[in-house]
Amino acid sequence: MISRCRFSFVFSVVSVFGLLSLVNVLADNSSLGSLQGDACVPVVDNGNVRFRGSLQNSFHKFSTEKLGHVVFLGGSITEMEGYRPRVVEWLTKRFPETQFTFTNAGIASTCSHTGAFRLERDVLNHGPVDLLLVEFAVNDDQDAHHSADDCLRGMEGIIRHVRRYNSRSDIVMIDFVNPEMLATAQLGNTQLSVAQHERVARHYEISSIDLPAELADRIAAGSITWETFGGTHPGPLGNQMAADLVAEVLSAGWSVAAASAESVGAHLEPAEPLIATCFDHGKFVPAESIRPGDGWQHGIPEWKSIAGSQRERFAGKAFFHCTQPESTLSFQFSGQAVGAYVLAGPDAGQLEVQIDDGSWNTVELYHAYSGGLHYPRTVMFATGLSAGNHEVKVRLAKTHPEKSKGTAARILNFAVSE
């Protein structure tokens, strides 16, 4: 068990990369002091960098078993050569005898919904996760424009699914920052996606880093600017700052683990989720389960004849696509939510969707970023369905959004959650 002591002090943390940060730790009900003896152990807790729960399992795995599977899950901030390789370098130096497997599960533009549905394919199929570093606050905000409930559905779904697959998985959540999120933090408030993801972190006792608030504090102190941080996709200084904060919270957690007699074990899951319709059983529907009608094809599109750029990761992929209005496909599934992971380009149209012989509803594929790019996004057909089996019919609409140049649908995967 962790001892708590009623003592206030300021201690300095020198990161492994040489950046010095002063962290005020007030040993009340949320933070601990650092004293000689066994009464207290040091913990990072400055209001923006929050150590919660336990990192005992990853510490034991890395230091004793000398094996470790570390997963980085998120959008382009994760996919790019940014904070992630810096953390990889730090971990390999911190545990030089440990055989690590590092999984880069970042996909640019994707939100927490896509993350929840692709989790099985991109993360869990690579083996049990010892340490997960996850970020989706920026894309849930600026790309998906998620509601409060939708922010929870994706992020909570990820956490619950990871922990159901391996109840010993340690998790750290990093909330990155864009200009609007920074401006909100500078006013003393919290952007919706950050606030909702932090609710998930508190509910599951997951350590987290509120980068918008931390950056706002450092800008106010005159130690950094938005420009030197590097923007939404951070530059070298911003990525170093994020990596240092990750190193600090991990080091704090592992200091607790090293000083504790607590053994490794399962993380306790709350009896109830924050939102019952979270995507904690998210997965993609196998292509062979889809029944395409005339007009639908499964294969690689003739990209050279299609306007708009596409990212390399999608260029050679086969998937269902159609440009012929009123063409229909269908499939059956068991679960409470259904949608599609799509590429929405300059000619993206609309889908008409019917579930269980109900009314036909229109689903927009075109996105604000579709003008010159076949943009990856997840669109939901329905959430909160009754448990059990359902049938979905999908029809390409004759109409299309005003800004779109066509009626195309390019569906990478259909997605469901039980």
What are these model-derived regions, one by one?
Residues 138-139, 159-195:
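Active-site segments of SGNH/GDSL-like serine hydrolases
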Residues 146-154, 185-192, 230:
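Alpha-helix N-cap and loop-to-helix initiation/capping positions
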Residues 89, 150-153, 157-164, 196-199:
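Alpha-helical scaffolding segments of alpha/beta enzyme cores, especially the outer helices
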Residues 63, 71-73, 83-90, 114-152:
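Oxyanion-hole/transition-state-stabilizing segment in secreted/luminal serine hydrolases
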Residues 76-79, 107-112, 137-143, 169, ...:
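Solvent-exposed loop/turn segments at secondary-structure junctions
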Residues 1-73, 78-100, 127-128, 223, ...:
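N-terminal secretory targeting modules
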Residues 30-33, 170-176, 191-227, 240-254:
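Extracellular serine-dependent O-acyl
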Residues 69-73, 101-106, 130-136, 170-175, ...:
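Structural recognition of the beta-strand scaffold that forms the well-ordered cores
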